[in-house]
């Protein structure tokens, strides 16, 4: 694997890359990640089995469109490819620390709101299907938000659970209920990070950074709801966001529907206590 990476990196840079340092670094639960250096420049390398190339290709597109918005900082794409046995993605390496101070948190809130305001997309979805963690995230274009979220988010995850032999509710009935609950909410399509938990943001020398996106055009409230559910963000993050674009009336009820998508996905990936959490959240939503 490493000879292939070094060769492609040399070709991309237009000069020989001589590997003088390679250090394993934290990069989540899915990929094996490294910092590599030629003694001058440093790069962040994600690796996995060869079949993961489709995931890395999707991540490249996610990062591209977020960078195009010129609103938030994301890692710079260098290259991706495969060896005989592995797939890899190379980004610029950035020294990070937690996004835990008030000023930078507020700044990121402002940046996220500007990301959500960017663009003039008329429909909900994305140009490609991508991944939320290790799970395929289908993104066919829809004109109606309620239809998109009910079918391509909630219905999709419930179907994946059913294939595992788990039936929390009648899928068709619950999907129709979600459509009804969201029918009177007509958000403008916003470019979403899509997986905005505290572990996917950081602080670097020149400001906040976000990474590992699962982008699509959807209701901006989905990003905020997930940030609340996972926790870790400073209050100033939410204050910064609302200083630019206050949340709409009804968000407190909609956020449970939006976060159900992530709870279901966590069960489909990790199992365990997320099943009980999903059941309780479904019961809460049905009780409204």
Swiss-Prot record:
It is an enzyme of class 2 (transferase). One of its GO terms (molecular function) is ATP binding. ATP binds at residues 92-94. The active site is at 195 (proton acceptor). The keyword ATP-binding applies. Its EC number is 2.7.1.-. InterPro entries: Fructo-/Ketosamine-3-kinase, Kinase-like_dom_sf. The keyword Kinase applies. Keywords: ATP-binding, Kinase, Nucleotide-binding, Transferase. Ketoamine kinase that phosphorylates ketoamines on the third carbon of the sugar moiety to generate ketoamine 3-phosphate. Belongs to the fructosamine kinase family. This is Probable ketoamine kinase VC_1539. The lineage of its organism: Bacteria, Pseudomonadati, Pseudomonadota, Gammaproteobacteria, Vibrionales.
């Amino acid at each position: 694997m490493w000879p292939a990476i070094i060769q492609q990196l040399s070709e991309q840079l237009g000069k020989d890359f001589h590997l003088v340092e390679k250090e394993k670094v934290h990069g989540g639960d899915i990929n094996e990640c490294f910092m590599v250096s030629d003694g001058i420049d440093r790069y962040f390398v994600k690796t996995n089995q060869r079949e993961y190339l489709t995931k890395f290709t999707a991540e490249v597109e996610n990062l591209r469109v977020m960078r195009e918005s010129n609103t938030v900082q994301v890692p710079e794409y260098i290259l991706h490819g495969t060896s005989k046995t592995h797939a890899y993605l190379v980004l610029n390496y950035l020294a990070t620390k937690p996004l835990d101070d008030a000023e930078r948190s507020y700044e990121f809130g402002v940046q996220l709101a500007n990301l959500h305001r960017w663009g003039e997309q008329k429909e909900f979805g994305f140009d490609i299907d991508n991944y939320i963690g290790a799970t395929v995230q289908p993104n066919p274009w829809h004109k109606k938000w309620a239809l998109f979220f009910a079918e391509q988010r909630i219905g999709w995850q419930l179907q994946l659970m059913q294939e595992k032999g788990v039936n929390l509710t009648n899928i068709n009935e619950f999907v129709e209920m979600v459509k009804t609950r969201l029918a009177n909410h007509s958000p403008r399509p916003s470019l979403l990070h899509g997986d905005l938990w505290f572990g996917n943001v950081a602080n670097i020398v020149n400001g906040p950074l976000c990474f590992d996106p699962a982008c699509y055009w959807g209701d901006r409230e989905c990003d905020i709801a997930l940030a609340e559910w996972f926790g870790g963000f400073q209050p100033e993050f939410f204050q910064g966001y609302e200083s630019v674009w206050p949340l709409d009336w009804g968000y407190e009820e909609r956020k449970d529907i939006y976060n159900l998508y992530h709870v279901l996905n966590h069960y489909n990936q990790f199992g365990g206590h997320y099943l009980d959490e999903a059941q309780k959240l479904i019961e809460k939503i049905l009780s409204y």
